[in-house]
């Protein structure tokens, strides 16, 4: 691989991924010889070489592959890790979820889905005073709830999540479906590597949104258990029973995750 900027980006990943990621980048070039060169000369998110940050999760630790659509379209928010908004720290406030969480619509709905899954909210009542009541309980010292988004990310990692996007970059002048199409060969290589791990069953593929669901066209995805849902941007995600059943046993809002 001749792109020095991509080699530098690999330094933020776990070394177990390096051969896979290099192979994946070669697949991108094979499909579109000039794509990476054009990208290198353009402005894109995430910045500071964080394009592969999700791959800090070691290859052999992956039990779930969660795929969203693309990075947040804001520099502070785009981290290279699916749905982990860099502009968010505190999860709670005195009146409910924090202002930062409420501004990040997908994250807000994911949090509410987790609260429903944990029995803290009912599907019919997920706004206003009931959320404020949960927030007050969550912030009590004896409650043992996570308090920050990095803690939520740590709990997801502890449960074996690889948090990817269908498109690894965001550019305002490139439609997200087109950007995602360019990265499909890369993701296919990643999934093949996960399917081929010796002595390990393929992880569960969790696809959120229409762009992520397009990965189902890849033959390799037939080897994976799958959980497919609408994008969390949609309010209906909060009531998605399949997602509640998937995430409920993980107790992701617990400060001491024992999974």
Show which residues each predicted segment covers.
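Proline-rich intrinsically disordered, low-complexity coils
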Residues: 19, 71, 175-176, 202-203, ...
